Design a protein with these regions (language model features):
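P-loop (Walker A) phosphate-binding loop of NTP-binding proteins
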Residues: 9-11
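ATP-dependent small-molecule kinase phosphotransfer cores
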Residues: 37-98, 102-106
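The feature captures the helix immediately C-terminal to the Walker
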Residues: 20-21
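Pre-Walker A (Motif I) flank of P-loop NTPase domains
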Residues: 1-6
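ATP-binding Walker
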Residues: 14
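Conserved phosphate-donor/acceptor-positioning beta-strand/loop module used by diverse small-molecule
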Residues: 96-101, 111-126
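Walker A/P-loop
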Residues: 17
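Post-Walker A helix-loop "phosphate-sensing" segment adjacent to the P-loop in P-loop NTPases
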Residues: 24-34
Protein backbone atom coordinates (compact mmCIF):
# COMPACT_ATOMS: atom_id res chain seq x y z
CA UNK A 1 0.00 0.00 0.00
CA UNK A 2 1.30 3.42 -0.94
CA UNK A 3 1.53 5.73 2.10
CA UNK A 4 -0.81 8.70 2.32
CA UNK A 5 -1.26 11.57 4.80
CA UNK A 6 -3.85 11.14 7.55
CA UNK A 7 -5.37 14.44 8.67
CA UNK A 8 -6.99 14.52 12.10
CA UNK A 9 -9.10 17.52 13.14
CA UNK A 10 -11.59 18.34 15.87
CA UNK A 11 -12.82 21.15 18.05
CA UNK A 12 -10.42 22.01 20.87
CA UNK A 13 -10.61 19.52 23.73
CA UNK A 14 -12.34 16.76 21.74
CA UNK A 15 -9.52 14.27 22.35
CA UNK A 16 -7.73 14.20 19.00
CA UNK A 17 -4.26 14.13 20.57
CA UNK A 18 -5.25 11.30 22.94
CA UNK A 19 -6.68 9.28 20.05
CA UNK A 20 -3.65 9.87 17.82
CA UNK A 21 -1.26 8.95 20.65
CA UNK A 22 -3.12 5.64 21.10
CA UNK A 23 -2.88 4.90 17.36
CA UNK A 24 0.84 5.72 17.32
CA UNK A 25 1.48 3.24 20.15
CA UNK A 26 -0.23 0.43 18.22
CA UNK A 27 0.80 1.00 14.61
CA UNK A 28 4.35 1.48 13.33
CA UNK A 29 3.15 2.24 9.79
CA UNK A 30 2.09 5.74 10.92
CA UNK A 31 4.01 8.62 12.50
CA UNK A 32 3.18 12.09 13.71
CA UNK A 33 4.58 14.87 11.54
CA UNK A 34 7.07 17.08 13.34
CA UNK A 35 5.95 20.66 12.84
CA UNK A 36 7.99 23.85 12.97
CA UNK A 37 7.72 26.85 15.26
CA UNK A 38 9.58 30.04 16.06
CA UNK A 39 8.76 29.93 19.77
CA UNK A 40 11.43 28.94 22.27
CA UNK A 41 11.55 25.30 23.38
CA UNK A 42 9.81 24.56 26.66
CA UNK A 43 11.53 22.55 29.37
CA UNK A 44 12.11 19.01 28.15
CA UNK A 45 11.32 19.72 24.48
CA UNK A 46 13.90 18.63 21.91
CA UNK A 47 14.54 20.09 18.48
CA UNK A 48 13.56 17.62 15.77
CA UNK A 49 11.54 15.53 18.23
CA UNK A 50 8.81 17.78 19.60
CA UNK A 51 9.16 20.56 17.01
CA UNK A 52 11.64 21.94 14.57
CA UNK A 53 12.63 25.13 16.42
CA UNK A 54 13.45 27.73 13.79
CA UNK A 55 14.32 31.41 13.81
CA UNK A 56 11.81 33.86 12.36
CA UNK A 57 14.17 34.36 9.42
CA UNK A 58 14.32 30.59 8.73
CA UNK A 59 10.53 30.29 8.91
CA UNK A 60 9.90 33.29 6.64
CA UNK A 61 12.41 31.96 4.10
CA UNK A 62 10.62 28.59 4.09
CA UNK A 63 7.31 30.39 3.45
CA UNK A 64 8.79 32.42 0.57
CA UNK A 65 10.30 29.29 -1.00
CA UNK A 66 6.96 27.45 -0.84
CA UNK A 67 8.36 24.86 1.57
CA UNK A 68 5.51 25.13 4.10
CA UNK A 69 2.50 22.90 3.62
CA UNK A 70 0.48 25.18 5.85
CA UNK A 71 1.35 27.76 8.47
CA UNK A 72 -0.10 30.41 10.77
CA UNK A 73 1.15 33.23 12.92
CA UNK A 74 -0.16 33.02 16.48
CA UNK A 75 0.60 36.17 18.44
CA UNK A 76 4.33 36.69 17.82
CA UNK A 77 5.25 33.14 16.76
CA UNK A 78 4.93 31.11 13.59
CA UNK A 79 3.69 27.52 13.57
CA UNK A 80 3.49 25.29 10.52
CA UNK A 81 4.13 22.06 8.69
CA UNK A 82 7.21 21.76 6.49
CA UNK A 83 6.23 19.87 3.34
CA UNK A 84 9.51 17.95 3.64
CA UNK A 85 8.38 16.48 6.99
CA UNK A 86 5.38 14.89 5.27
CA UNK A 87 7.22 13.80 2.12
CA UNK A 88 10.16 12.28 4.04
CA UNK A 89 7.84 10.00 6.03
CA UNK A 90 6.01 8.85 2.89
CA UNK A 91 9.34 8.09 1.16
CA UNK A 92 10.04 5.74 4.08
CA UNK A 93 6.69 3.99 3.54
CA UNK A 94 5.10 5.62 6.59
CA UNK A 95 1.71 7.37 6.64
CA UNK A 96 2.19 10.82 8.19
CA UNK A 97 -0.43 11.90 10.74
CA UNK A 98 -1.17 15.61 10.88
CA UNK A 99 -3.12 16.89 13.88
CA UNK A 100 -4.39 20.25 12.64
CA UNK A 101 -7.39 22.56 12.60
CA UNK A 102 -10.11 22.41 9.94
CA UNK A 103 -8.69 25.28 7.89
CA UNK A 104 -5.27 23.63 7.86
CA UNK A 105 -6.92 20.34 6.89
CA UNK A 106 -8.43 21.97 3.80
CA UNK A 107 -5.05 23.37 2.79
CA UNK A 108 -3.33 20.00 3.20
CA UNK A 109 -6.12 18.12 1.39
CA UNK A 110 -5.77 20.50 -1.58
CA UNK A 111 -2.08 19.56 -1.87
CA UNK A 112 -2.54 15.86 -1.09
CA UNK A 113 -5.91 14.85 -2.59
CA UNK A 114 -5.31 11.22 -1.54
CA UNK A 115 -5.09 12.22 2.14
CA UNK A 116 -7.54 10.60 4.54
CA UNK A 117 -9.41 13.06 6.73
CA UNK A 118 -10.74 12.26 10.18
CA UNK A 119 -12.92 14.72 12.08
CA UNK A 120 -13.46 13.86 15.72
CA UNK A 121 -16.75 15.05 17.16
CA UNK A 122 -17.01 15.30 20.95
CA UNK A 123 -20.08 13.84 22.69
CA UNK A 124 -21.10 17.41 23.50
CA UNK A 125 -19.80 20.86 22.65
CA UNK A 126 -20.61 22.03 26.18
Amino acid sequence: MKPFPIIVSSPSGAGKTTIVDAVLKRDTSVSRVITATTRAPRTGEKNGVDYHFWTIKQFEQAIKKGQMLEWAQVHTHYYGIPKKSVDDLMKKGICPILVIDVQGARTVKAQYPNAATVFIVPPSLK
